[in-house]
Amino acid sequence: MRYDNVKPCPFCGCPSVTVKAISGYYRAKCNGCESRTGYGGSEKEALERWNKRTTGNNNGGVHV
């Protein structure tokens, strides 16, 4: 399925994202490098997590 208003992957820049449901939980995954979010309770929550970006952390990395 194609999703509107989804940010490209922060790691590889791929614009293609898939949401997968496993046992009633959902996660978003990059179709390029396969980075993914943690699980959420809905497809909408998984996409919101995907689009949420932080400016950094103690390790200097980017969280999805």
Swiss-Prot record:
Coiled coil: none
GO biological process: DNA restriction-modification system; response to antibiotic
Pfam families on file: Lar_restr_allev (PF14354)
Leading EC class: hydrolase
Record bears the keyword Protein transport: no
UniProt keyword list: Antibiotic resistance, Calcium, Endonuclease, Hydrolase, Magnesium, Nuclease, Restriction system, Toxin-antitoxin system
Keyword GTP-binding tagged: no
Induction: The sRNA antitoxin RalA probably works by inhibiting translation of the RalR mRNA. The ability of RalA to block the toxicity of RalR relies on a 16-nt sequence which is complementary to a section of the RalR coding region; in the presence of RalA sRNA decreased amounts of RalR protein accumulate with no significant changes in the level of RalR RNA.
Enzyme Commission number, as recorded: 3.1.-.-
One Gene Ontology MF term: double-stranded DNA endonuclease activity
Cofactor(s) in the UniProt record: Ca(2+); Mg(2+)
Activity regulation (UniProt): Inhibited by EDTA.
Disruption phenotype: The single ralR and double ralR-ralA mutant have increased sensitivity to the antibiotic fosfomycin.
InterPro entries assigned to the protein according to its UniProt record, in alphabetical order: Toxin_RalR (IPR019908)
Main function: Toxic component of a type I toxin-antitoxin (TA) system. Upon overexpression inhibits growth and reduces colony-forming units in both the presence and absence of the Rac prophage, cells become filamentous. Has deoxyribonuclease activity (probably endonucleolytic), does not digest RNA. Its toxic effects are neutralized by sRNA antitoxin RalA, which is encoded in trans on the opposite DNA strand. Has RAL-like activity.
Extra remark beyond the main annotation: This protein is encoded on the Rac prophage.
Protein name in the entry: Endodeoxyribonuclease toxin RalR
Organism of origin: Escherichia coli (strain K12)
